[in-house]
Amino acid sequence: MTPTIITDVKAFAIKPDRHNLVVVKVETNKGVSGLGCATFQFRPLAVKTVVDEYLRPLLLGRDANQIEDLWQVMNVNSYWRNGPITNNAISGVDMALWDIKGQLADMPLYQLLGGKARTAIPAYTHAVADNLEDLYQEIDRFLAEGYRYIRCQLGFYGGNPSQLQTPDQPIAGSYFDQTDYMDTTLKMFAAIQERYGNQFQMLHDVHERLHPNQAIQFAKAAEPFNLFFLEDILPPDQNKWLQQLRSQSATPIATGELFNNPMEWQELVKNQQIDFMRAHVSQIGGITPALKLAHFCDAMGIRIAWHTPSDISPVGLAVNNHLNIHLHNAAIQETIAIPANTQSVFGGSPQPENGYFYPIEKSGIGITFDEAAAAEFPVVYRPHEWTQSRTPDGTLITP
């Protein structure tokens, strides 16, 4: 096979709608270019800098066909590795290289990886409201659209300090009463189960805001509600507690969206302490490491549910789609409606149909990127207050 020489590497940091997105474009001497998702919405310009200033000169003139070797070169080039900024930058290039290979082969990515493991992948979406009646309306809408898996959240991750017993002159920010949250959420599960029966299966995301003993209590109390999974019940630096949780609760546990380093998942997978791996593909370095992680999980009976939030580009969403169609142990695909401006920048964004994502049949990843349209949406700094929730006494919660 003749070499496919990399002639340019570009990173684009944009904010077409609510979230900052980062996309990488790799160009070659064969006139074929590829796209990759490098979105780390909290540090978009840092990722762009790594791509433009460090990876670009490293990659120019190299053979785009040699994806494994190029991934290894990028991973060790800075010596220190496995951090979110570098991993996302590497991911953008890695996905783009797979996109190029698929186009050169005239094959969709899932076919390039080995073909279908299923006809379509079930999807789940998010029903979020401040009260039960509004939440029911959200659920009814999603049921009408064909969803049979719905993540249910009552309120967001925080609260109003004026409604909590806080010290005088509380620190400004988002507040979160862990005991009240557990009580309110369990009552929500019961109300939804009574109203809807088995019309759909609930999921729920704790977003790492409980202490270990609270997490065990909550998972045990959630057992009667037959959740598809309970997500991120602990922060990753407390995941050793999952061994105790697993021994005391049958509630399926999913975690992984904060993972960057293989050391964060190796023991969890080897010891079968989780049911679902929720890694974010760009956060772990792209398609190349995602395939290795998925196969490791498959050998240990752990299913895949890639993190697919609203702060992911349609390129990243499409990659998850391809992986989920191909991987034997893929279980479900998260999805949130893609806003209008984002759709104007990215062509071919995958959309669920009656609760499923079907294979993308275009060659490569199958997404287009309008650079002129993207230029209309420059990146904007956001403080992301929701990552800085506090307990009523003002203590910062570590997500």
Curated annotation (Swiss-Prot):
Gene3D superfamilies the record matches: Enolase-like C-terminal domain, Enolase-like, N-terminal domain
Function (record text): Has no detectable activity with D-mannonate and with a panel of 70 other acid sugars (in vitro), in spite of the conservation of the residues that are expected to be important for catalytic activity and cofactor binding. May have evolved a divergent function.
Record PANTHER family: D-GALACTONATE DEHYDRATASE-RELATED (PTHR48080), STARVATION-SENSING PROTEIN RSPA (PTHR48080:SF6)
Keywords, in A-Z order: Magnesium, Metal-binding
Organism expressing this protein natively: Enterococcus casseliflavus (strain EC10)
Lineage start: Bacteria, Bacillati, Bacillota, Bacilli, Lactobacillales
Annotated binding of D-arabinonate, by residue: H207, E257, R278, H307, E334
Family: Belongs to the mandelate racemase/muconate lactonizing enzyme family. GalD subfamily.
Pfam families the record matches: MR_MLE_C, MR_MLE_N
Biological process annotations from GO: amino acid catabolic process
Annotated residues for binding of Mg(2+): D205, E231, E257
Transmembrane segments: none
UniProt name for this protein: D-galactonate dehydratase family member ECAG_02205
SMART domains: MR_MLE
One GO MF term attached to the UniProt entry: magnesium ion binding
